[in-house]
Amino acid sequence: MAKVAKDLNPGVQKMSLGQQQSARGVPCLRCKGTCSGFEPHSWRKICKSCKCSQEDHFLSSDLEDDRKIGRLLMDSKYSTLTARVKGGDGIRIYKRNRMIMTNPIATGKDPTFDTITYEWAPPGVTQKLGLQYMELIPKEKQPVTGTEGAYYRRRQLMHQLPIYDQDPSRCRGLLESELKVMEEFVKQYKSEALGVGEVALPGQGGLPKEEGKQQEKPEGAETAAPTANGSLGDPSKEYVCELCKGVAPADSPVVYSDRAGYSKQWHPACFVCAKCSEPLVDLIYFWKDGAPWCGRHYCESLRPRCSGCDEIIFSEDYQRVEDLAWHRKHFVCEGCEQQLGGRAYIITKGQLLCPTCSKSKRT
């Protein structure tokens, strides 16, 4: 049972509304023209006009995404995937790997080229292996610039890896005591759970890479694939996907997790969150209970998430109803915004409403 609420001071409140304000008026992609344009709520991560989420209106920029992932991976064993920002006071940025494919098109005398840019590609692999990996992902989720797949990736970066799950300055009203709890929480998951999947041929996970490139078996070679310790494996060995239990062909890339150990592998399309079953964006995962999780659901499995502001709750004093939780100050009606602590309320499809607003929604 939650304790009696105390008066909360503003505490640590550094989050800038600059991005929200600059997106003011942006139409909602979900409402298809019925929304008058993005109107930021003062503390919910939604539009006041249509109640849809921020990511239904706008997405963070490439630079913001790369800074966010750089911050996530810094101070972890994956910091080699980041680079220091010159004059950035120790800030690190994600060294996102892109892949550009250029194919000539035969059209008359002047040659033309068809160029495809993947906004993200697995690091440390040859272009051939990277392309094989992409072909094993559903086409609508391939992060090709200007396509639905690129939009899907950027949306998942916002949803699976919320900036306010790792950066206290992006949380609203943290008390000093909560700030310390959050800092320890982040430090612990970076040390014990955070991981980045590795793409390799079956049996080659964990092997050293030459100049950052994954080694490939020569065309037509019949040699056995090396094991993780560098010795030659049994050429007749079957490699099985950890999720679907299907066979992984020896010439087809798989995903490895060093948290799981290199005896386990996943088909590229099977490396998904154990909770929501969505592909793990940029292969970033959190290891828990013998499976990879996305950042959002990993954090929620350890601490409650406020159904009002979407931030993790780092206080022991909060409101819980069934499997939902709220900061006490956010236990308010989603319709009229009145405080509902000690008052009648109704929860319908995850929405917290006062009786009056609930009745008006039904009529």
Curated annotation (Swiss-Prot):
Domain PET: residue ranges: 99-206
Pfam families: LIM, PET
Molecular function terms from GO: transcription corepressor activity; zinc ion binding
Keyword Isomerase: no
Compartments, record wording: Cytoplasm; Nucleus
Gene Ontology cellular component list: cytoplasm; nucleus
PROSITE patterns, per the entry: LIM_DOMAIN_1 (PS00478), LIM_DOMAIN_2 (PS50023), PET (PS51303)
Xref: InterPro entries: PET_domain, PET_testin, Pk/Esn/Tes, Znf_LIM
Keywords from the named record: Cytoplasm, LIM domain, Metal-binding, Nucleus, Phosphoprotein, Repeat, Repressor, Transcription, Transcription regulation, Zinc
Residues covered by the LIM zinc-binding domain: 239-304, 305-363
Region Disordered, residue ranges: 200-233
Tissue expression from the record: Highly expressed in both skeletal muscle and cardiac muscle.
Composition bias, Basic and acidic residues: 208-220
Modified residues (Phosphoserine): 16
Record's comment describing the protein's domains: The LIM zinc-binding domains and the Cys-rich region mediate interaction with GATA6.
Job of this protein: Transcriptional cofactor that restricts GATA6 function by inhibiting DNA-binding, resulting in repression of GATA6 transcriptional activation of downstream target genes. Represses GATA6-mediated trans activation of lung- and cardiac tissue-specific promoters. Inhibits DNA-binding by GATA4 and GATA1 to the cTNC promoter. Plays a critical role in the development of cardiac hypertrophy via activation of calcineurin/nuclear factor of activated T-cells signaling pathway.
Binding partners and assembly: Interacts with beta-dystroglycan. Interacts with GATA1, GATA4 and GATA6.
UniProt xrefs under PANTHER family: LIM AND CYSTEINE-RICH DOMAINS PROTEIN 1, LIM DOMAIN-CONTAINING PROTEIN
UniProt-recorded name of the protein: LIM and cysteine-rich domains protein 1
Organism listed in the record: Sus scrofa
Gene assigned in the entry: LMCD1
